[in-house]
UniProtKB/Swiss-Prot annotation:
Family: Belongs to the TatA/E family.
The protein's name in its UniProt record: Sec-independent protein translocase protein TatA
Gene Ontology terms, MF aspect: protein transmembrane transporter activity
Subunit description: Forms a complex with TatC.
Ranges of biased composition (kind: Basic and acidic residues): 56-66, 77-88
Organism of derivation: Prochlorococcus marinus (strain MIT 9301)
NCBIfam families: PRK14857.1, PRK14861.1, tatAE
Pfam families membership: TatA_B_E
Membrane topology qualifier: Single-pass membrane protein
Amino acid sequence: MNIFGVGLPEVTVILILALLIFGPKKLPELGKQLGKTLKSLKKASNEFQNEIDQVMKEEDKDESPKSIESNQSNEINQEKIDSENSNN
């Protein structure tokens, strides 16, 4: 078991310390709150990642026609240069 780089012995020590500090009555309440916090952080992280992915897809769609036009104009320019060089 390895959660966030913390193994089973470390988790055990953390749980024992939490039990001693907060007591057995508050521990379930703290666990629920920690779970809710982690869930909301994960949700926010997923939403942020989805927004980044969506922007990247939109940029790819916008970039595709430009890159095609750019490649075509580069090829035309290169053909002009090649024909000028062959004429000289």
